[in-house]
């Protein structure tokens, strides 16, 4: 039975039983604690917790959820039962049926006849486990279903009490196992041999909520869930393994085709030895996982999800090389896995080109690194072993990372294969030093000095109270003054200083928003604040110029925000949130923020996306953003716990460290809800118009949108309008006809350029007609050494040379054509086929000429070109060429 049929039978079984079929959610969810969806119930978590009402007609649902687990990537392929990507088929009940219903449904599908839509498994080969004290489940299995008591085994919390490993729903579970027969191990049920007895379905009786803890059995139970729920998960790949009667999941119809392709590409046979087999399985598993991650919008990167994808793709590449592949392999692997997965995921067809481009681009980049880095590692490993050591030094691992881009996990893998260990502590120490230097450089740029210990006293004892959300003017006390990185007791007129206040309404740069501008006032004393930076997330440092008067530590002052600056900064920051929301509407949920910068009237927003946006997409994003502005939504902020914010649906950035209390900025309810500590307008209409300036690539898988907001946007649009009106006037056409008129002009220009080029080539041919009259016969070789008119470009020289060479036909001939082109000396050398046979080589002659005119170049035996800088040496170069031809 093919995998897609297994999926269909599962879904049909539960739909016929009144469950609503729910499509698989994306592997990427807005959860800062979750890299990828790793269980079938994850998309249903809010319903299990009672935070949202299940939208399913009968309170029941079924889905086949794509999942990724990457905690033990290194183990993939070593065992044959685990995959990084898997499909979890599940049925869910939210307060409807409980243990008996879940058990009955599962047993009916597994043992039901194939003719009736079941899987037709032999009931005598099925075993079950239950939680230690779950007498109710054990009784249902024995009394209601008829499973003999000797095939019902009880296990502890680590095996039969399910949770996600983090706070959330949990409960006892009952697992169904299939006995694969005595050739796979000893008898005695799952407790005796879990290789012979393969787990295929887990029925979780979701009735409790777990708290913090470690491991599978060391956590607190916080209490009961609002309702008794059912969450089950059947491993599609494992059931396929049984129904297709193959040894393991890698032999099924989904993964075996990739192994077959790998055999062809590498010349190695699967099954020949264990080490090779592990590499084959790595290729098959990672090809599927990598493809599905790219499908859901993940791009290779150096952290978070992007790093996991990069690591998977690089393990594919390296495994293929170790098996014997010599060229690129990613295209073949990706094509194969897309073919096998498309019947279950038809959306692959629409994304095929993008998936291929991302994977192949990563392969080509890594292959350049792999060869040189592997050579360096092998040299290091040889010297380490020769010295009688078994450890790769931290400095060596760091050099591989810093110079060749080798991630530490790849070095660890290579070291293990070579029987070596790695000084990970030493590596981490060097990485920390590098980060510290980078941080110091960044701080030096912001503060003019790298020693931040000078702020320690205030950070520890007098953190700044920020009042800028409530007021723009604040009574403050001067706690400290600094100049050129040193503490001072007073500041005088004309001095550039850093001012520490006990409280301040001025926003310190963070979250992409620039620090406020403003003033610090005391009587006639005026300090113009031109930047505010944050130290240790607690201390505000006001960089200011004493414009008038003087200031001393202990003075009571008024700190005042430049109100125009703040208003325009608020406009830009709120516009950033709207653009982010619009991006996700147009491009999908994986278009997540990768960075931003907001300042008055201007913003730039970086986001994860692999492809250039079309003009239509940019226009749509701008339209959605301005519609949100026009709707005049209230911009609400609330401080709450991180868990509550996530329950509200607030978007958090993966990898960010959030405190126990976070600030949620909500605009238009579900339209935009993000964790943010910045300043914002009160209503979206206060932003004014938002004008997108365009989008561009700033790195692999990261793109940038830039925009104006408020008055800057109005001014920009006014200039654009004036430009359009000017063009319309010049072209004597209405504005709406400008695109067509400009296109017509461009077409005419291209046609004129082609005509000019044709005339130019005609003139060139006419000029070359008699040039061979200047040729000399040197030892039977027709030789033309010629300086043509000045400012003849390299392309024309090449045309002249090839034309003359063709005219020589079967004769032995060598041509050197050069010109003085604004101080540069382009030149071309050509040799006929007969001359090449005699020993002439254009590439060698180019190097010879270049040595006389301070130039260089290269090419093939029959045609080569170069460029020099010393026209005065050309005659000597010609003489050298004559001598070279005489020697042929």
From Swiss-Prot:
GO cellular component terms, A-Z: cytosol
The record's free-text note on cofactor binding: Binds 1 zinc ion per subunit.
Binding site for Zn(2+): 573, 577, 676, 680
Top-level enzyme category: ligase
Signal peptide per UniProt: none
Main localization category: cytoplasm
Enzymatic reactions: tRNA(Ala) + L-alanine + ATP = L-alanyl-tRNA(Ala) + AMP + diphosphate
Database matches in Pfam families: DHHA1, tRNA-synt_2c, tRNA_SAD
Molecular function terms, GO-annotated: alanine-tRNA ligase activity; aminoacyl-tRNA deacylase activity; ATP binding; tRNA binding; zinc ion binding
GO biological process, one term: alanyl-tRNA aminoacylation
Keywords assigned by UniProt, alphabetized: Aminoacyl-tRNA synthetase, ATP-binding, Cytoplasm, Ligase, Metal-binding, Nucleotide-binding, Protein biosynthesis, RNA-binding, tRNA-binding, Zinc
EC number: 6.1.1.7
Location relative to the cell: Cytoplasm
Top-level taxon: Bacteria
InterPro entries for this protein: aa-tRNA-synth_II/BPL/LPL, Ala-tRNA-lgiase_IIc, Ala-tRNA-ligase_IIc_anticod-bd, Ala-tRNA-synth_IIc_core, Ala-tRNA-synth_IIc_N, Ala-tRNA_ligase, Ala_tRNA_ligase_euk/bac, DHHA1_dom
Cofactor requirements of the protein: Zn(2+)
Function: Catalyzes the attachment of alanine to tRNA(Ala) in a two-step reaction: alanine is first activated by ATP to form Ala-AMP and then transferred to the acceptor end of tRNA(Ala). Also edits incorrectly charged Ser-tRNA(Ala) and Gly-tRNA(Ala) via its editing domain.
Note on domains (UniProt): Consists of three domains; the N-terminal catalytic domain, the editing domain and the C-terminal C-Ala domain. The editing domain removes incorrectly charged amino acids, while the C-Ala domain, along with tRNA(Ala), serves as a bridge to cooperatively bring together the editing and aminoacylation centers thus stimulating deacylation of misacylated tRNAs.
Family annotation (NCBIfam families): alaS
Family in the record: Belongs to the class-II aminoacyl-tRNA synthetase family.
Name under which the protein is recorded: Alanine--tRNA ligase
Native source species: Corynebacterium glutamicum (strain ATCC 13032 / DSM 20300 / JCM 1318 / BCRC 11384 / CCUG 27702 / LMG 3730 / NBRC 12168 / NCIMB 10025 / NRRL B-2784 / 534)
Record gene name: alaS
């Amino acid at each position: 039975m093919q995998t897609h049929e297994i999926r269909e039978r599962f879904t049909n079984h539960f739909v016929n039983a009144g469950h609503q079929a729910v499509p698989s959610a994306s592997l990427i969810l807005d959860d800062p604690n979750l890299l990828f969806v790793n269980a079938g119930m994850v998309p249903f978590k809010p319903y299990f917790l009672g935070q949202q009402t299940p939208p399913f007609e009968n309170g029941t649902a079924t889905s086949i959820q794509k999942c990724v687990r990457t905690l033990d990537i290194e183990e993939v392929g070593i065992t044959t039962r685990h995959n990084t990507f898997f499909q979890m088929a599940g049925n869910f009940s939210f307060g409807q049926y409980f243990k008996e219903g879940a058990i009955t449904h599962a047993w009916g599908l597994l043992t039901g006849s194939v003719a009736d839509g079941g899987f037709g498994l032999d009931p005598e080969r099925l075993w079950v486990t239950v939680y230690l004290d779950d007498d109710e489940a054990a009784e249902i299995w024995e009394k209601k279903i008829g499973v003999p008591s000797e095939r019902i085994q009880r296990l502890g919390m680590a095996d039969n009490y399910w949770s996600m490993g983090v706070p959330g729903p949990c409960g006892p579970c009952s697992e169904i196992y299939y006995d694969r027969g005595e050739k796979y191990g000893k008898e005695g049920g799952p407790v005796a041999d879990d290789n012979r007895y393969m787990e295929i379905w887990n029925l979780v009786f979701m009735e409790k909520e777990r708290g913090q803890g470690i491991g599978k059995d060391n956590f607190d139970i916080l209490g009961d869930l609002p309702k008794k729920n059912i969450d089950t998960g059947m491993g599609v790949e494992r059931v396929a393994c049984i129904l297709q009667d193959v040894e393991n999941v890698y032999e099924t119809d989904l993964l075996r085709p990739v192994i077959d392709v790998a055999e062809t590409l590498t010349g190695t046979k699967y099954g020949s030895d264990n080490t090779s087999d592990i590499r084959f399985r790595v290729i098959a598993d990672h090809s599927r996982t990598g493809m599905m991650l790219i499908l859901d919008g993940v791009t290779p990167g150096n952290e978070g999800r992007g790093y996991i994808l990069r690591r998977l793709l690089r393990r594919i590449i390296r495994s293929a090389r170790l098996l014997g592949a010599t060229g690129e392999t990613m295209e073949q692997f990706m094509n194969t896995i897309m073919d096998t997965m498309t019947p279950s995921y038809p959306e692959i067809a629409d994304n095929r080109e993008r998936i291929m481009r991302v994977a192949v681009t990563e392969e080509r980049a890594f292959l350049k690194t792999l060869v040189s880095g592997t050579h360096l590692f092998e040299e290091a490993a040889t010297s380490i072993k020769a010295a009688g050591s078994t450890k790769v030094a931290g400095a060596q691992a760091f050099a591989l990372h810093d110079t060749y881009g080798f991630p530490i996990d790849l070095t660890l893998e290579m070291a293990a294969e070579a029987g070596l260990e790695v000084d990970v502590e030493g590596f981490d120490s060097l990485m920390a030093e590098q980060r510290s230097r980078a941080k110091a450089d960044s701080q030096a740029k912001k503060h003019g000095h790298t020693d931040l210990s000078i702020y320690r006293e205030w950070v520890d004892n007098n953190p700044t109270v920020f009042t800028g959300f409530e007021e723009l003017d604040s009574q403050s006390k001067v706690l400290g003054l600094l100049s050129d990185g040193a503490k001072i007791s007073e500041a005088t007129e004309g001095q550039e200083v850093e001012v520490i206040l006990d409280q301040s309404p001025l926003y310190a740069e963070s979250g992409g928003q620039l620090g406020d501008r403003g003033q610090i006032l005391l009587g006639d004393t005026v300090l113009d604040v031109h930047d505010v930076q944050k130290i240790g997330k607690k201390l505000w440092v006001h960089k200011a110029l004493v414009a008038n008067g003087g200031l001393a530590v202990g003075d009571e002052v008024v700190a005042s925000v430049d109100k125009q600056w703040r208003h325009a900064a608020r406009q830009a920051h709120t516009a950033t949130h709207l653009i982010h929301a619009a991006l996700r509407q147009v491009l999908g949920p994986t278009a997540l923020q990768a960075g931003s910068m907001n300042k008055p009237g201007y913003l730039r927003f970086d986001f994860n996306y692999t492809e250039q946006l079309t003009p239509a997409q940019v226009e749509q994003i701008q339209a959605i953003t301005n519609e949100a502005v026009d709707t005049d939504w209230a911009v609400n902020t609330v401080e709450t716990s991180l868990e509550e914010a996530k329950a509200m649906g607030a978007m958090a950035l993966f990898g960010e460290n959030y405190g126990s209390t976070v600030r949620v900025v909500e605009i238009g309810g579900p339209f935009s809800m993000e964790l943010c500590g910045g300043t914002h307008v009160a209503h979206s209409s206060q932003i004014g118009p938002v004008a997108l300036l365009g989008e561009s690539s700033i790195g692999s898988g990261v793109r940038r949108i830039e925009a104006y907001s408020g008055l800057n946007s109005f001014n920009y649009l006014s200039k654009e309008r004036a430009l359009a009106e000017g063009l319309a006037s010049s072209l004597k056409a209405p504005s709406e006809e400008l695109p067509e008129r400009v296109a017509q002009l461009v077409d005419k220009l291209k046609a004129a350029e082609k005509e000019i080029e044709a005339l130019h080539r005609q003139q060139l041919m006419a000029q070359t007609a008699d040039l061979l009259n200047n040729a000399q016969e040197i030892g039977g070789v027709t030789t033309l050494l010629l300086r043509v008119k000045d400012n003849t470009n390299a392309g024309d020289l090449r045309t002249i040379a090839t034309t003359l060479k063709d005219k020589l036909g079967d004769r032995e001939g060598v041509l050197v054509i050069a010109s003085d082109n604004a101080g540069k000396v382009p030149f071309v050398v050509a040799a006929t086929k007969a001359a090449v046979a005699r020993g002439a080589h254009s590439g060698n002659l180019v190097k010879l000429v270049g040595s006389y005119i301070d130039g260089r170049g290269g090419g093939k035996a029959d045609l080569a070109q170069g460029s020099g800088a010393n026209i005065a040496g050309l005659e000597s170069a010609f003489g050298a060429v004559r001598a070279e031809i005489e020697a042929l």
